[in-house]
Amino acid sequence: MPRSQKNDNFIDKTFSIIADLIVKILPTNKESKEAFYYYKDGMAAQSEGEYAEALACYYQALKIEKDPMDKSFILYNIGLIQASNGQHARALEYYHESLKFNPNLVQALNNIAVIYHYYGNKLFEQSKLQEAKLMFDKASNYWRKAIKLAPYNYIEAQNWLKITGRITEDIML
């Protein structure tokens, strides 16, 4: 079942070896181990740009995985692939779904904000100013949530919030 590593990246190989050892010695059930192997294989495929293979692995992991936190990361990674393929609406669905399992998944909050900001820019370019404002407001809401959880990670988002007058005192550094 484990995917063979195509690249010669020392860190990736080391991670894979250590992860395999940990999974073997952890007192966990067979399904959790199987889900982890699919997830790990999905990450390896995703890092190599093999998105179809990665998605197949993630969907298998999702069928098996029971742990909400682990499900959130699987859904998040599916969202990353959808966004990479320009499927922003689908990416949003997966990011939102990941937040149902892990509301503090700061990366998903940020990526949702990025997509809403992108939509806002597109609408602004089309002179659809009211709709653009709604998208920018949505982006700011998600960035504020992300910044509250990780205040030093999203400096550009903080600057955008300041420049556009959307920053609130509870997130100012």
From Swiss-Prot:
Topology in membrane: Peripheral membrane protein
TPR repeats: 35-68, 72-105, 120-153
Localisation per UniProt entry: Plastid, Chloroplast thylakoid membrane
Domain of life: Eukaryota
Primary residence: plastid
SUPFAM superfamilies in alphabetical order: TPR-like
Gene Ontology cellular component terms for the protein in this record: chloroplast thylakoid membrane
InterPro entries per UniProt: PSI_Ycf3_assembly (IPR022818), TPR-like_helical_dom_sf (IPR011990), TPR_rpt (IPR019734)
Keywords: Chloroplast, Membrane, Photosynthesis, Plastid, Repeat, Thylakoid, TPR repeat
GO BP terms: photosynthesis
NCBIfam families, alphabetized: PRK02603.1 (NF002725)
Similarity comment text for this entry: Belongs to the Ycf3 family.
Protein task: Essential for the assembly of the photosystem I (PSI) complex. May act as a chaperone-like factor to guide the assembly of the PSI subunits.
Protein name, entry field: Photosystem I assembly protein Ycf3
Gene: ycf3
